[in-house]
Amino acid sequence: MELVNPGYGSGFTFKLTKWKNIKRGYTHFADGDIAFAKITPCFQNRKSVIFKNLPSGIGAGTTELKVLRPYYRQMSHEYILAFLQSPYFIDEATFKGTANQQRIVSGYVENKLFPLPPIEEQQRITKRLEEISKMI
């Protein structure tokens, strides 16, 4: 989880390793996938990412990542990421588990209402969010 940057944005770093070492016991993802932390406090710290430019096009990470793979072409990856980092998504989550190992409840993402405007509006929103974040 330490390789995914907290806060708004989509920064991450990676380590190269042999696939046989990470084939099992890890969450797998590919270029274009969007992932977010499902464990506290990383979830509240908005640890989320759009995976881009992975050396082999695929990767593996902690099992504490929830990976989303948008198939619908009319969905902006940046818009989805902004939604995942929004107070609406973060603040309304409920958790389950022990005090030190709480995770978002199963089905939270699948049952969350997702506002989906036309692609042009998604792009306008994410462009404006980028402009505002540069001012902060």
Show where each model-derived region lies.
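DNA target-recognition patches
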Residues: 1-22
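Short Ser/Thr-interspersed hydrophobic loop/turn segments at strand-loop and sheet-helix junctions
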Residues: 3-9, 26-48, 60-65, 72, ...
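Catalytic cores of nucleotide-enabled group-transfer and carboxylate-activating enzymes in metabolic
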Residues: 46, 70, 74, 83, ...
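A structural micro-motif recognizing beta-strand termini
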Residues: 53-54, 69-71
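A short glycine-rich beta-alpha junction/loop motif
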Residues: 58-66, 98-117
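Short amphipathic alpha-helical coupling segments at ligand-binding clamshell hinges
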Residues: 76-83, 121, 128
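Amphipathic alpha-helical coiled-coil/heptad-repeat segments
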Residues: 91, 111-136
